[in-house]
Amino acid sequence: MKNVAQHDVEKQIAELREQIEKHNYAYYVLDQPSISDAEYDELMRKLMELEEQYPQYKTPDSPSQRVGGAPLEAFRKVTHRVPMLSLSNAFNEGDLRDFDRRVRQEVGDVRYVCELKIDGLAVSLRYEDGYFVQGATRGDGTTGEDITENLKTIRSLPLRLRQQVTIEVRGEAYMPRKSFEKLNEKRKMNGEELFANPRNAAAGSLRQLDPKVAASRQLDIFAYHVVNAEELGILSHSAALNYLDELGFKTNPARQVCETIDDVLSYIEQWHERRASLPYDIDGIVIKVDAFAQQKQLGATAKSPRWAIAYKFPAEEVVTQLVDIELSVGRTGVVTPTAILQPVRVAGTIVQRASLHNEDYIREKDIRLGDYVVIKKAGDIIPEVVCSLPERRTGKEEPFDMPTHCPACASELVRLDDEVALRCVNPQCPAQIREGLIHFVSRQAMNIDGLGEKVIAQLFEHRLVRSVADLYTLTKDELVALERMGEKSATNLLQAIEASKQNSLERLLFGLGIRHVGAKAAKTLAEHFETMERLQQATKEELMAIHEIGEKMADSIVTYFSKEEVKQLLERLRAYGVNMTYKGAKQTIDISSTFAGKTFVLTGTLQSMSRSEAKEKIETLGGKVTGSVSKKTDVVVVGEDAGSKLEKAKQLGITIWDEARFLQEIQQSKQV
């Protein structure tokens, strides 16, 4: 029997939870904050303090569970009770009218529900007796991954519903633009690779094994479908969305019921114009038959329902003025021109810079200083200049000529054989050294946390670092003298630098920035030669005998290790205790694997993994991945929104695998 004091504590905890969830709903779902951030933080602090003191009163639906628990070892596989199908796409008015005609021929009069197509990650959410018990990714549509702990960190997702109902809901997890911009700014400061777009950032966040990482990313979610709606007595999609509102889910308020296809087209036109004003990315409109009875009558193919279609917006193009062209020197010496623009909003973000690729591109497009230009942003971090608008010229515009000398060190620029880029070949070029340092400490290379671009710029400016080896001579006093570098940060950074000495050889190889040697080739070389010394002594012929090492890469490796300054650098790194041996397991390829010796091409978007993950799996199983389809291609792996590569594969009679077949072959090859 509980004593009075315990009863009071339990009551206090329950009241705190109720208050916090009420404020959560007001802030994250209704977008109407009811208290200040400081007041909210104080309520949360009190709750967590009480739950820490009285763990017997901690429950799975407590708001405290949203901060993220202990890291997971791996994601458990989840089989969807009802497959998560993808949608067929429409790209123009004709496609939509064809869809409407097919639907009406089958079911007669119909009304549609139009919804914004949120550019995020589809997830399945299962509740039992009103409590959130499991969340999973779409995966291949049949099997996904259990990401329950990461989904719990999304503040707008209810952990307990307003009714004790058992329900399965589908939703779209996404990253708002402000959260995306903050995240990329932080990653840039830390010298980490930037996310290309909010969708990739959301997907990457939900696939973190540490829920605290997901909690820090400020994700959001819209619920859009009730899987077992008819069991609950719901007869239409619009009614199901209203029911989700009643339960406490966040649904998209922009949805609209349309009686005709013309109403649908008006809705699409309206949101095509307004999409930039939204605080999140959308890439189209989803159109669904409203009545469940008609949905059932229309049925589905193996891949997609016949009662729904997704209209995809074309990539957004806008016009602005090019005010200048800025030149930057990369770590390999390539001089890249970037357009400096009058600020303009594209796809919801303010753009001031756009890629101009190279000198040939500027000349072919006749792009001049002062021109009005068309820019396009289709998922890339930096948009590109599509073309200039000569008809808007006033006569004041000036043709742009690439310089003959490096903007960073004044050395003469050269254009190597078969290259369009101009290159600075001075190994002492400060811009190349600085960019090389940023590459060396990056996540895929030596992974030195805390050494972002701004810190490296300061180290460079204070002449503390002129080579990657200098990083291993830094002292605490030198670091503390830097701007915004306290004692604790300096200590952490020195520990990270020290820890990097134990990295396996492939990380060091990639970090050195040998021309043509990417992360995968570095792993191959490290695995084959096992020590830096053996690799340094390798001949061109020995290198070319290795699968995936071609003549160009072999020449580059031999040239690199023959340089006196490289030999001196490696000697310094050895002296400082940097590991130069391969620590991984020797890879053996089973020649009976379906992948062994075959050439693959990837096209479209895979739901279960990224393009780079798919490439790595193929290569691990003995296959090779190329970027274009030819007669030498053995298999084309097709994801959603596959393009011209799929058509070419069909024309050439090349074997085509969908994602389900691809995953099946991977599994079978692992079991061989």
UniProtKB/Swiss-Prot annotation:
Organism field: Anoxybacillus flavithermus (strain DSM 21510 / WK1)
Gene3D superfamilies in the record: 5' to 3' exonuclease, C-terminal subdomain, 6.20.10.30, BRCT domain, DNA ligase/mRNA capping enzyme, Helix hairpin bin, Nucleic acid-binding proteins
Segments forming domain BRCT: 590-672
Keyword Metal-binding attached: yes
Residue ranges the record marks as coiled coil: none
Lineage of the organism: Bacteria, Bacillati, Bacillota, Bacilli, Bacillales
One biological process term in Gene Ontology: DNA replication
Record-listed NAD(+) binding positions: D37, A38, E39, Y40, D41, S86, L87, E115, R138, E172, K288, K312
Protein name per the record: DNA ligase
Alphabetic keyword roster: DNA damage, DNA repair, DNA replication, Ligase, Magnesium, Manganese, Metal-binding, NAD, Zinc
Primary role: DNA ligase that catalyzes the formation of phosphodiester linkages between 5'-phosphoryl and 3'-hydroxyl groups in double-stranded DNA using NAD as a coenzyme and as the energy source for the reaction. It is essential for DNA replication and repair of damaged DNA.
Gene Ontology molecular-function annotations: DNA binding; DNA ligase (NAD+) activity; metal ion binding
Residues the record lists as binding Zn(2+): C406, C409, C424, C429
Catalyzed reactions per annotation: NAD(+) + (deoxyribonucleotide)n-3'-hydroxyl + 5'-phospho-(deoxyribonucleotide)m = (deoxyribonucleotide)n+m + AMP + beta-nicotinamide D-nucleotide
Active-site residue list: K117
Cofactor: Mg(2+); Mn(2+)
Family membership: Belongs to the NAD-dependent DNA ligase family. LigA subfamily.
InterPro entries reported in the protein's UniProt record: BRCT_dom, BRCT_dom_sf, DisA/LigA_HHH, DNA_ligase, DNA_ligase_AS, DNA_ligase_CS, DNAligase_adenylation, DNAligase_N
CDD domains: BRCT_DNA_ligase_like, LIGANc
